[in-house]
């Protein structure tokens, strides 16, 4: 670990000492985890002002609904029958605490340092965080993408609309309970002279091989 990276970490930790924030340096990268999602805007505003994080390079999210679960049947039965074919599990939309985590990537060109700031959305009933588009205009579209893909809402966002899927799209494609095949498929109907939507007739099937790590 470089002494310069440690110096940045110590200074930023001191700035955030009054908040519920945990930090670490791992694989040469600085990461801070915010405990309370209500503090996100205030903490990011403080980082921009006091440590000159002028640039927000990305906003994204992770859905941990199926974390640690496998589509493959393993255990004692494997030694007798071999691996089963992986089957796509039917996960119902679940209100699971700590299911979603939102992640911000910040860059300070003045201090030549990048950090990652993340926060678990602890309350499954409140999938809402404050928008930071007033701090970094680039957040406008990245927050729209997170809303479109994960269904996370951003309070005070100036234009929270879908940005990658069409206006009539149902669901959020990067949620773990969204089927890989989707719900509908579209085609051009020559008789009607327009594009029509029809239910998907493809069965879900796992195409990812079982990976064994020692």
Swiss-Prot record:
SUPFAM superfamilies, per the entry: Nqo5-like
**Pfam families given for it?**
Complex1_30kDa
Give a yes or no for keyword Coiled coil in this entry: no
GO function term, MF aspect, one: NADH dehydrogenase (ubiquinone) activity
* Subcellular compartments: Cell inner membrane
One cellular-component annotation, GO: plasma membrane
Identify the main location: membrane
**Catalysed reactions listed for this entry:** a quinone + NADH + 5 H(+)(in) = a quinol + NAD(+) + 4 H(+)(out)
Q: What is its EC number?
A: 7.1.1.-
Transport in keyword set: yes
Annotated disulfide bonds:
none
User: Do you know which InterPro entries this protein is assigned to?
Assistant: NADH_DH_suC, NADH_quin_OxRdtase_su_C/D-like, NADH_UbQ_OxRdtase_30kDa_su, NADH_UbQ_OxRdtase_CS
**Superkingdom classification of source:** Bacteria
Name the PANTHER family for this protein.
NADH DEHYDROGENASE [UBIQUINONE] IRON-SULFUR PROTEIN 3, MITOCHONDRIAL (PTHR10884:SF14), NADH DEHYDROGENASE UBIQUINONE IRON-SULFUR PROTEIN 3 (PTHR10884)
On subunit structure and binding partners, the annotation says: NDH-1 is composed of 14 different subunits. Subunits NuoB, C, D, E, F, and G constitute the peripheral sector of the complex.
Name the family the entry cites. Belongs to the complex I 30 kDa subunit family.
Question: What functional role does this protein have?
Answer: NDH-1 shuttles electrons from NADH, via FMN and iron-sulfur (Fe-S) centers, to quinones in the respiratory chain. The immediate electron acceptor for the enzyme in this species is believed to be ubiquinone. Couples the redox reaction to proton translocation (for every two electrons transferred, four hydrogen ions are translocated across the cytoplasmic membrane), and thus conserves the redox energy in a proton gradient.
Protein name (database record): NADH-quinone oxidoreductase subunit C
């Amino acid at each position: 670990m470089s002494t310069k990276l440690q110096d940045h970490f110590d200074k930023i930790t001191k700035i955030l000492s009054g908040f519920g924030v945990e930090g670490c340096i791992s694989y040469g990268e600085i990461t801070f985890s915010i405990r309370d999602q209500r503090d996100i805007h205030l903490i990011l505003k403080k980082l921009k002002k006091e440590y000159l994080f002028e640039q927000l390079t990305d906003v994204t999210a992770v859905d941990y609904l199926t974390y640690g679960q496998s589509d493959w049947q393993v255990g004692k039965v494997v030694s007798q029958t071999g691996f089963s074919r992986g089957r796509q599990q039917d996960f119902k939309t679940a209100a699971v605490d700590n299911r979603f985590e939102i992640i911000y990537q910040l860059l300070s060109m003045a201090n030549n340092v990048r950090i990652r700031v993340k926060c678990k959305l602890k309350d499954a009933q409140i999938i809402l965080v404050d928008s930071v588009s007033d701090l970094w205009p680039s957040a406008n579209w990245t927050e729209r993408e997170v809303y479109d893909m994960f269904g996370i809402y951003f309070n005070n966002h100036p234009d929270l609309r879908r940005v990658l899927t069409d206006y009539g799209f149902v669901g959020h494609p990067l949620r773990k309970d969204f089927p890989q095949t989707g719900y509908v498929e579209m085609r051009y109907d020559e008789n009607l002279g327009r594009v029509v939507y029809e239910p998907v007739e493809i069965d879900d099937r796992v195409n990812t091989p079982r990976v064994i790590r020692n």
